[in-house]
Each structure stands twice: as structure tokens, then as C-alpha cells.
């Protein structure tokens, strides 16, 4: 009871939590005081002793039903006396007006200037109110299911069910409610008031200035120290509930479960934090373009801004800011390029062994969170157009995920353009067939052909043309698992003339289609040109040799294949090669590209061929005693039973 009496005594005296004086017998927790909203009564004036009789003080009534008593020293202005009391409550004198209460005229007050000598007001009662055109910071939260893609403004994670302020548009998860800033203001009005306190008020009641967008406000809040954010946004801070009824869209004020945050506790009426406002305006002023301030002489106001009758829409784009600070700042999720997450710093990759060199680059074995293959492309001083084309193709390659495709892991742009891919411990198909001369069974060769066709079918379904399909770019990973690499990248497989991309014959000569060699079209590469290269790979599998081995001159091969005088010798195919495979090889290497099949048809043909191959199945009537892990697992009684019974 003593605690309750002390609480009522404190509330009846009208002190706020921060200014309340508690004696030892009347100490109560903030939660008890928070349940009682302060209501100033006329009888309160007679209960308090006049502060002028004891010291040089002034009693001040503040917004949100708060009050304080300030000490006055000689030479201090009214602004100096009240600055600290306003600052701890997040107020600014420019946003408020001060009045002297006239007791001889009940209910009336006289406005004072902030530069008034405070000594002349000792013993008086003052009242500080918000200016009429300065909005309060009351959030208007409502539950919302975001059917469109949305992200939490606090944790930047995907948001489906959460809350949204109907006034400022701030959206967040329920578990992020403790970090919601208390700011919910018309930032254009705040900015106009602070930048141009003496400007002429327009027809709408406020100076007509470009408004500060919500995005910039949130960026300024994100730059605040964590301690400052928690100071003004924590739900455990003492707040004063207003006596006005809550809006329809606000959350219910009933007591919630202690396991879930009370979102309403951050939606109480609080003043705007001055430091947050200054930070937002400072960042906006630095980023504003000087040309935005220019206007015709007829439309200029005394402050240098135009004053249209209708509000000026918020600026949608922010002027670029140069400097290292902008580079080091984390970019918002909505503005960051998705390929940003795939770019690898060159300092993070350690190159070790040089694996080989091709017509488009050099391959190294490297370390980046494990073994990787790094292909440094032969592109010296890429132009902006070439660099952008490379990034566009990387955006396509990073979406490839298939069991028969070499995994793309990232790219590098510093010093040289480079591609980082999965490392395959096995050798390439070229080494197996022509260097190590590995002897494969026919069913193994057919399975390699099927996996290769399956991977190429996936690439073509993604509208990716390989352009350099050959046995050197087919890897056998962990046994006989096929991995296709070095696909796409038309940027580095083309010749550039200034800013224009010019197609040229690319790839190894033996695997190049006749139309690619002739280069009669602007872009001869197509799905059918990849099919021709795949047909040469089938020829290697079914013969163990390279085509045109009897011709030693490279230029002669180019001339004869391009003119249609030479084609792979199909008589060298293995004798045990199935007839369906022979027909498939012949169809893939046809000289007219329209007559070649596409990979969906090729894949179905090989799968049908695999099912038709004869298989030796184990007899189901004979036991497999040798499969037992231990001989004692076999029941000895079974072995000594009557000969009439079967032995298992």
C-alpha cells in the first residue's frame, strides 16, 4: 500500500518519469507509473509550492503531458534554459513555440521569443507546444500480408506476414518490432522548417520545398549508432500515453503474451529526435545537385525555392556521391546488383598449378574455400561495353545447376577477367581417349554420350550456346560422371572492333561446324553448330581417334570442311558399335545444319538405345552364399538338413 500511495502522490504532483522525485518509501517500477496517464487538473496548481519562493526557477509544461522545472542564472536566455530539457526529449526549439501562461486571464497565454531574458520570467509558468505545421510522431501500424516481394526494413530479410505503418510505410517482422524507430513524420515539412525557419508560408501552410524521400530517411537512421537507435526505439523506455483515442489502424493496446513483442509500445506519441533529423537533412544536403536549386526568376521565393500550390513529389533518384565513404557503405538490398554477390576478390583466391592454356584463356588450379579451377580469360583492357557484356553472361551462367554441368562459383574482374568453377579431380575425355588411351566398354561409351547429351540439352534449354564443344571441355568426375565446362562466354569468344562485337570462328578446328568456318552469317553459332561439335565427340568415342588424322595441314582442314569436301570417316567406327549409334553420328555431322537433330531428340535416341542393349541378369533361383559377411551367419542346421530340402 505504501508503494501505491507513493505512486499516486507522484502522479498527482504531475511529474514525468525522468523528473519525478522519489523518496525511499515511494519507489515504484516504471511499469506501474506507465499504467497511469498524467492528467493535469486545475487543483494541481494549489498543491505545489511556488518555486519562486525557494529558488530562481521556472515551471515549464512540455508536450505529451510532461513538465519540468528549470533553474535560471543571470544572462541566460529562454533558449539556453530550456535547451537541455528539450534535448533529452528529442525536441528542437525550432519545432516548438514557448508561451507564458496568463493567470489573470484564465486559459490565455502569450507567446514569447526564444531570446527573451530568462531572469525576467522567474516564478512564471511557461508552456511549450509544437508548431501547427510540425506533425507528431505517431505510427499507425496495421497487420499486413505482403503478396508481392517485400523485405523487412530492419533485418532486410524476406517479409510475408508482418506489420506496416499506414503513414510512413515502414514494414517489419513482429520479432523486429523492438527496433522500429519512433519517427513517423512528414519529412518534407521537417526539412523545410529546419532549413528555412523564416521562409514564407505557402497556401498549404508549409513552404513548398522538395520533400525528403522515405529511403533517405531510412538510410540516415541506419547510420545512427546502435546506442542512439535503442535510446529512442526501445519498447522498455518510459512513455506517456495520450488521452486521445487510438486510430482505427493502430494495434490493440491489450496486454499481449510475454513471449511476443508488444508492437504497440513503439507506436506511442513521441517527439522527433533532433539528431536523427539533422543527420537526415545533412546527408540530403550533401547529395543534392546544385542544379536542382536553380529556377527561373519568376518562380523564386526569397529563400531561393519555388512555391507551387501543389506539393512537389518526392525525388525518386539520389545524386551519386563520390568518395571512399560511398564505396565502403553497404548498398541497400533493392539497389544492389544481383551479380554483386558472385564477384570474388582476387586476394581471396590462391593460384597454385597451371593446368593448361587454350585459345580463350589459361586454367589454373586454385584455393578458394577448397579446390577450384580458375580460368583467366585472354581479354586485355576490356572496354565498358565488353565488360558489361561479360557481366550479363555471368548473370546467365550463375543460374546453371545440373549434374552434368561444371558448377559455376564466381568471377573476378580485378586486373583480368576470370571465371571460378568447380574443380574436377578426373581427367578430360580427350586425355582418356588420346593420351592415356583408357579402354572403355561399349556400354560405358554410350553412357558418356548420354550424359553429355543430357548436359547439352540443359544448356540449350537455358538458351546457352556452348560455342566450343569438344572432348577437352568434357571432364570425367569421380568415375564416369560427365561434367561439361567452358560453356557460354560469347564475350571472350568474339572479336571486338571498338564498341561493336564482331563474330569470328571460335573453337578448335576439328570440332567446328562448316557454317561456322565459312562465317557467311553475322552469327553462325546455333544449337545445330553445337550438335555438329557433339557429333565429332561421338566420333571420338566410337573410334578412339581424332577426325581427319590423315591431313596434317590445319588450313587444308579448314578449307575442305568449310567447302564440304571433307567429312569424318564413319568406316572407322568400332565394329561392335550399335547401328543406332552409327546413324546418330552420321546425322549429327551432316553438312546442312537444318538436317541435324536437336539435343532433345538425340537424348531420347541414346536412352532408347541403352534400354535395348542386352543385359545379363543374375538368376533368381540360385542363392548367393558368398554375399554373407561372415560364414558363421549361415545357419549350420541348414547345411546339414535332409537332401530333399533346398539349401539356402
From Swiss-Prot:
It is found in: Cytoplasm; Cell membrane; Mitochondrion; Nucleus. Changing residue 375 to W: Catalytically inactive. Residues 349-609 form the Protein kinase domain. A zinc finger (Phorbol-ester/DAG-type) spans 138-184. The modification Phosphothreonine is found at residues 268-269, 491. GO terms for biological process: apoptotic process; death-inducing signaling complex assembly; ERBB2-ERBB3 signaling pathway; extrinsic apoptotic signaling pathway via death domain receptors; face development; insulin receptor signaling pathway; insulin secretion involved in cellular response to glucose stimulus; insulin-like growth factor receptor signaling pathway. Changing residue 494 to D: Increased kinase activity but can still be inhibited by PPP5C. The active site is at 468 (proton acceptor). Changing residue 261 to S: In NS5; shows in vitro greater kinase activity and enhanced MAPK1 activation than wild-type. GO terms for molecular function: adenylate cyclase activator activity; ATP binding; enzyme binding; identical protein binding; MAP kinase kinase kinase activity; protein kinase activity; protein serine kinase activity; protein serine/threonine kinase activity. Residues 56-131 form the RBD domain. Residues 331-349 are annotated as: Interaction with PEBP1/RKIP. Residues 239-271 have a biased composition (Polar residues). The modification Phosphotyrosine is found at residues 340-341. PANTHER family: RAF PROTO-ONCOGENE SERINE_THREONINE-PROTEIN KINASE, SERINE/THREONINE-PROTEIN KINASE TNNI3K-RELATED. Serine/threonine-protein kinase that acts as a regulatory link between the membrane-associated Ras GTPases and the MAPK/ERK cascade, and this critical regulatory link functions as a switch determining cell fate decisions including proliferation, differentiation, apoptosis, survival and oncogenic transformation. RAF1 activation initiates a mitogen-activated protein kinase (MAPK) cascade that comprises a sequential phosphorylation of the dual-specific MAPK kinases (MAP2K1/MEK1 and MAP2K2/MEK2) and the extracellular signal-regulated kinases (MAPK3/ERK1 and MAPK1/ERK2). This is RAF proto-oncogene serine/threonine-protein kinase. It comes from Homo sapiens. The gene is RAF1.
